[in-house]
Regions:
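Acidic glycine-/aspartate-rich tracts in secreted/extracellular proteins
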Residues: 59-63, 93-95, 102-105, 150, ...
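Autoprocessing Asn-cyclization modules and mimics
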Residues: 16-84, 92-100, 129-140
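Bacterial Sec-dependent N-terminal signal peptides
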Residues: 1-17
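Ligand-binding face of N-terminal immunoglobulin V-set domains in extracellular IgSF glycoproteins
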Residues: 72-73, 81-82, 87, 105-106, ...
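Glycine-centric low-complexity/flexibility signal
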Residues: 123, 130-337
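Short, intrinsically disordered, charge-balanced linker/junction segments flanking boundaries
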Residues: 14, 340-342
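Short coil-to-beta-strand transition motifs
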Residues: 77-86, 117-123, 153
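Extended Gly/Ser/Thr-rich low-complexity repeat segments
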Residues: 47-60, 105-123, 155-156
């Protein structure tokens, strides 16, 4: 009698998820109820479920010196800007999201608070460039995900230029005050003495023109024809260029000042978008806008295999050459936060 024996080998295949493009969803927050661990959004929430992970983040709200002096833009109080924490969704009702954990940090809704849906994976492969929805003034600018296993890069994770926005071009009069030039640090469109400042953690201010740097945003170039200052993050931004053909009849030696550096430490544990560059001064329709800053990348994983690919969060460059007017400042670099033992 022929006896046949069959051996069956059980192979466990862990789920590998292929990702690329944009994986996060973003919502601005209109109020934070710390006592009840919940936030309110502007509209009914769709696409968020119990057990989902979300980042609660305050993007702006810093208080700065607004005097028309060299101290302009110095940070007096971060006022919650940069605070963030990872939370688990306990309940979703209409426009209210309640979290399982207590909200531990302070958030001011006026400081542009957002929640970011954070996907959770086992093993994950980045097959095409992974990026963020650019910051739009109320949400965006963040790439974040969790992997219980290995993250394999077959493409870059790139948040370049998705941070705070560069200053837009503002057309002012030629040769301020009869050619004396404007040497102030902040002004409005009525005074019209300089270009728009770049955006930073202090938000957009009423007197948003002129060379003073608002926190990590770059200052706008002053009349006449000076360049905008570069945005900043941990390091200070660079100053803009002066007018190349200075003359007694039309000054131009007060360029935009580079953004102020931000205080970052393991104790504070803050995360910031890169500051936007200031615009160049424009009176002949040839200036260029400031460039956007870099975004934030947050990854928690067991291990990351790079395969020669990179995680990038540079400030954007100003790619257009100014003509007869000031050039915009480049964006400040963003921030990359990793929790990966291997």
């Amino acid at each position: 009698m022929l006896m046949l024996f069959f051996c069956v080998t059980l192979i466990r295949v862990s789920a590998q998820t292929i990702i690329g493009a944009t994986i996060n969803s973003y919502w601005p927050v209109i109020s934070v109820d710390v006592c009840n661990n919940r936030v309110a959004l502007p509209a009914i929430v769709v696409g968020v479920n119990i057990g989902d992970k979300m980042l609660l983040m305050q993007m702006q709200g810093a208080i700065i010196d607004t005097s028309d002096t060299p101290a302009y833009g110095t940070i007096l109080d971060y006022n919650g800007a940069g605070n963030y924490e990872l939370l688990t969704v306990a309940n979703v009702t209409n426009n209210i999201i309640t979290f399982q954990e207590a909200i531990m940090r302070t958030y001011h809704a006026a400081g542009k608070v957002q929640v970011v849906l954070v996907p959770q994976y086992n093993d994950v492969i980045v097959a095409s460039t992974l990026t963020a929805q650019p910051w739009n003034g109320s949400s965006g600018g963040v790439i974040a995900f969790i992997a219980s296993g290995t993250v394999t890069l077959n493409a870059d994770i790139d948040a370049t230029g998705t941070g705070f926005r560069g200053g837009a071009v503002f057309h002012d009069s030629f040769c301020y005050a009869g050619g004396l030039g404007y040497d102030g640090y902040r002004c409005n469109t009525v005074l019209s003495g300089g270009a728009n400042k770049g955006e930073g953690i202090a938000g957009t201010l009423y007197q948003n023109l002129g060379r003073g740097a608002p926190a990590n945003g770059g200052g706008g170039g002053n009349d006449s024809n000076t360049g905008g200052g570069g945005g900043a993050n941990i390091l200070t931004g660079g100053n803009g260029g002066t007018r190349s053909n200075l003359s007694p009849g039309c000054a131009g030696d007060n360029p935009g000042i580079g953004g102020h550096s931000l205080a970052v430490s393991n104790v504070d544990n803050r995360a910031f978008l890169g500051g936007g560059g200031g615009a160049g001064d424009d009176n002949s329709n040839g200036a260029t806008a400031g460039a956007n800053g870099g975004g934030i990348i947050i990854i928690r994983a067991n291990s990351i295999v790079s395969n020669g690919y990179t995680l990038i969060s540079r400030g954007a460059d100003v790619v257009t050459t100014a003509s007869f007017d000031g050039g915009g400042g480049g964006g400040g670099g963003g921030m990359i936060c990793l929790d990966a033992p291997d």
